[in-house]
Amino acid sequence: MFERELEALGFEKTGDLIKIVPPDLFAELCQQSVQHLQRQRSGVDCHAIFQSFQAVGVHISEDELRKIIRGMTALFSTAAKYNVTCEELLSMLISKLPKQILQVIRHVWNEEGKHLCELQKSRDLLPSGELVDFHWKIGMAVSSDSCRSLNHPYVTVELKVADYSGQITSKILELTIPEFKNFHKQFKEMSAVLETV
């Protein structure tokens, strides 16, 4: 079951990308993935890891790095879901990854595997996206190619969200004042409901 689920998540393709990653950088990536799963950090800092890769001459695109991060997060969360031992995990990966990478995975799983399995049992392992940050500001439209009525205030809302793999993305919304008031009203309603729980 464990191996089939990893195949369904596309881990085979991730394994080919992992082979070019130096063990020390791979260890940092694994550590951030595990911390994200344990809710100790809001996400994996893909940009900082990418810069580290570039600094040591590892030629990989940001998209390929995101695939590695998703793959490692999936590996650890799936291994926790099936409560696999370190030997079971390594026996499944031995034909797919180099020895140095397997040593990193062994170290990380020996250190954190038990805790991840406990979190999985209590359903506290990060299953989906998480709101990391929320910013808003009010502005005034003074020029536009598509808008005829200018000099109207608007609100820009930026939501930073970490997906299940820890990748942080920003979503920006521009709302009119009535739309923002409705948005605010809905958040107040949610807050009132949460206070009764």
Curated annotation (Swiss-Prot):
PROSITE patterns: COMM (PS51269). Residues 130-197 form the COMM domain. Its main location: nucleus. InterPro entries: COMM, COMMD4/6/7/8. It is found in: Nucleus; Cytoplasm. GO terms for molecular function: NF-kappaB binding. Scaffold protein in the commander complex that is essential for endosomal recycling of transmembrane cargos; the commander complex is composed of the CCC subcomplex and the retriever subcomplex. May modulate activity of cullin-RING E3 ubiquitin ligase (CRL) complexes. Down-regulates activation of NF-kappa-B. Inhibits TNF-induced NFKB1 activation. PANTHER family: COMM DOMAIN-CONTAINING PROTEIN 4-8 FAMILY MEMBER (PTHR16231), COMM DOMAIN-CONTAINING PROTEIN 6 (PTHR16231:SF5). Component of the commander complex consisting of the CCC subcomplex and the retriever subcomplex. Component of the CCC subcomplex. Belongs to the COMM domain-containing protein 6 family. This is COMM domain-containing protein 6. It comes from Xenopus laevis.
